[in-house]
Amino acid sequence: MKPAVDEMFPEGAGPYVDLDEAGGSTGLLMDLAANEKAVHADFFNDFEDLFDDDDIQ
């Protein structure tokens, strides 16, 4: 017997959206772009210049 979805995910479906419900992949991309983006408060952005090719030897 396979577990039902509500048994596998008792807290609900979460932020996931079925492609058919989102109106296809284009609608899903628009939904993703419209959502607010957040970064963890203690994320330390210490990246050097990733695209700096002058330091390649």
Swiss-Prot record:
Pfam family, one: MYEOV2
Modified residues (Phosphothreonine): T26
Annotated family: Belongs to the CSN9 family.
Entry keyword annotation includes Endoplasmic reticulum: no
Identification of the protein by name: COP9 signalosome complex subunit 9
Organism: Homo sapiens (Human)
Keywords: Cytoplasm, Nucleus, Phosphoprotein, Signalosome
GO biological process: cellular response to UV; negative regulation of protein neddylation; positive regulation of cell population proliferation
Superkingdom: Eukaryota
Quaternary state and interactors: Component of the CSN complex, composed of COPS1/GPS1, COPS2, COPS3, COPS4, COPS5, COPS6, COPS7 (COPS7A or COPS7B), COPS8 and COPS9 isoform 1. In the complex, it interacts directly with COPS3, COPS5 and COPS6. Isoform 2 associates with CSN complex. Isoform 2 interacts with COPS5, CUL1, CUL3 and RPL11. According to PubMed:26456823, does not associate with CSN complex.
Signal sequence coordinates: none
Cellular component per GO, a single term: COP9 signalosome
Annotated effect of mutating F51A: Decreases interaction with CSN complex. Abolishes interaction with CSN complex
